[in-house]
Amino acid sequence: MNFNATFIGQMVAFAIFIYLTYRYVWPPIVAAMAERSKRIADGLQAADRAEKDLELAQKKVVEQLTSAKKEAAAIIDQANKRAIEIVEEAKLKAQQEAERVKASAQAEIELATSRAKEELRSKVVVLALAGAEKILESSIDQNAHNELVNKLAAEL
């Protein structure tokens, strides 16, 4: 192999090319690669954070659903208890009203019975007097008649 000036010139040109490449071309390439590597790493970290955040959010959702279900069950139980109380109150009021109506009806029956007895007494007295009058075929005077009516009414 022959070493001549061309070969040395090519070596010098190649050395200058390497120096210029190392000095001006290589730093932007390395910077771009470092930036890209950093973006990839940041993206992976963001994905990990997002995955953890998603897991936390899912746990919170499960906790909130459990809490809401418990609260709903408590509200339903409370509503059922209140409904039972309302039904019991209505039953009690209905029983009281029935007793009041029954007592009122009983009082009316007793009053009607009393009136019927009084009316029957007065009719019996009149009939007895009419019968006695026919038997005696004579008329009793008014004062004696009133006394006899009062006496018979008191006895009945």
Swiss-Prot record:
Entry keyword Cell inner membrane: yes
Keyword Transmembrane helix recorded: yes
Subcellular localization(s) per the UniProt record: Cell inner membrane
GO CC annotation terms, alphabetical: plasma membrane; proton-transporting ATP synthase complex
UniProt entry keywords in alphabetical sequence: ATP synthesis, Cell inner membrane, Cell membrane, CF(0), Hydrogen ion transport, Ion transport, Membrane, Transmembrane, Transmembrane helix, Transport
Residue ranges crossing the lipid bilayer per the database entry: 7-26
Membrane topology reported for the UniProt record: Single-pass membrane protein
Superkingdom as given in the UniProt entry: Bacteria
GO molecular function: proton-transporting ATP synthase activity, rotational mechanism; proton-transporting ATPase activity, rotational mechanism
Major localization listed first in the record, in broad terms: membrane
Record-stated family: Belongs to the ATPase B chain family.
Protein function: F(1)F(0) ATP synthase produces ATP from ADP in the presence of a proton or sodium gradient. F-type ATPases consist of two structural domains, F(1) containing the extramembraneous catalytic core and F(0) containing the membrane proton channel, linked together by a central stalk and a peripheral stalk. During catalysis, ATP synthesis in the catalytic domain of F(1) is coupled via a rotary mechanism of the central stalk subunits to proton translocation. Component of the F(0) channel, it forms part of the peripheral stalk, linking F(1) to F(0).
Subunit structure comment from the entry: F-type ATPases have 2 components, F(1) - the catalytic core - and F(0) - the membrane proton channel. F(1) has five subunits: alpha(3), beta(3), gamma(1), delta(1), epsilon(1). F(0) has three main subunits: a(1), b(2) and c(10-14). The alpha and beta chains form an alternating ring which encloses part of the gamma chain. F(1) is attached to F(0) by a central stalk formed by the gamma and epsilon chains, while a peripheral stalk is formed by the delta and b chains.
Protein name, UniProt field: ATP synthase subunit b
Species this chain originates from: Cellvibrio japonicus (strain Ueda107)
Gene name in the database record: atpF
